[in-house]
């Protein structure tokens, strides 16, 4: 029957953790995207690093195989929403950074759509089960929203925020005062 597969971490930390420039850059990204810890940032960096490595390895392939695999990789990244255009090149993939990935997190998109007042409130709404994608509750702020799912993000049907979104509640309190 065999032993179960050992689960390993999906992220790789920095090679040298105490470089001031990197620490400051990490703090800015953690604040901008409302991340809970640096591990979430390192996960994004690792995923982008793997996509860039794939693109570099495609450059060494013969032209026939390279073109088909290149199209597949570009289509995947386009569906994920990480690259903006469907006719991108390997240079566009090599130019990706962790911000391209962090922009596709559910937490960021909920905030940018205006469903939450702050990026931190967006995280709280997701964790507490107030956000749904296509009517299906999603409670993970790190969920990567595909390009086709972006328009389906809304409040969960039974959520009290469905009738009174956070932005409207704040406006009502100001008008009463």
UniProtKB/Swiss-Prot annotation:
Positions with biased composition (Polar residues): 165-177
Renumbered residue ranges of the record's region Disordered: 158-177
Domain of life: Archaea
Residues covered by the S4 RNA-binding domain: 104-166
Keyword Isomerase listed: no
Keywords: Ribonucleoprotein, Ribosomal protein, RNA-binding, rRNA-binding
GO biological process, one term: translation
Annotated Pfam families: Ribosomal_S4, S4
Annotated Gene Ontology cellular component terms: small ribosomal subunit
Entry keyword annotation includes Metal-binding: no
InterPro entries xref list: Ribosomal_uS4, Ribosomal_uS4_arc, Ribosomal_uS4_CS, Ribosomal_uS4_euk/arc, Ribosomal_uS4_N, S4_RNA-bd, S4_RNA-bd_sf
MF-aspect GO terms: rRNA binding; structural constituent of ribosome
PANTHER family: 30S 40S RIBOSOMAL PROTEIN, 40S RIBOSOMAL PROTEIN S9
Function: One of the primary rRNA binding proteins, it binds directly to 16S rRNA where it nucleates assembly of the body of the 30S subunit. With S5 and S12 plays an important role in translational accuracy.
Subunit structure comment from the entry: Part of the 30S ribosomal subunit. Contacts protein S5. The interaction surface between S4 and S5 is involved in control of translational fidelity.
Family the entry assigns: Belongs to the universal ribosomal protein uS4 family.
Protein name: Small ribosomal subunit protein uS4
Biological source species: Sulfurisphaera tokodaii (strain DSM 16993 / JCM 10545 / NBRC 100140 / 7)
Lineage: Archaea, Thermoproteota, Thermoprotei, Sulfolobales, Sulfolobaceae
């Amino acid at each position: 029957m065999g032993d179960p597969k050992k689960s390993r971490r999906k992220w790789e930390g920095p090679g040298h953790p105490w470089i001031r420039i990197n620490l400051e850059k990490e703090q800015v990204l953690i604040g901008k995207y409302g991340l809970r810890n640096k591990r979430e940032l390192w996960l994004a960096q690792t995923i982008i690093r793997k996509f860039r490595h794939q693109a570099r390895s495609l450059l060494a392939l013969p032209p026939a195989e390279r073109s088909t695999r290149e199209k597949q990789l570009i289509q995947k990244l386009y569906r994920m929403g990480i690259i903006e255009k469907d006719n991108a090149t390997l240079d566009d993939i090599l130019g990706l950074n962790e911000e391209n990935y962090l922009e596709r997190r559910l937490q960021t998109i909920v905030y940018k759509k205006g469903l939450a007042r702050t990026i931190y409130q967006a995280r709280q709404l997701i964790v507490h089960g107030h956000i749904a994608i296509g009517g299906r509750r999603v409670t993970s702020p790190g969920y990567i929203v595909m390009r086709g799912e972006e328009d389906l993000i809304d409040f969960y049907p039974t959520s009290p925020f469905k009738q009174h979104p956070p932005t409207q509640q704040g406006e009502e309190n100001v008008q009463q005062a």
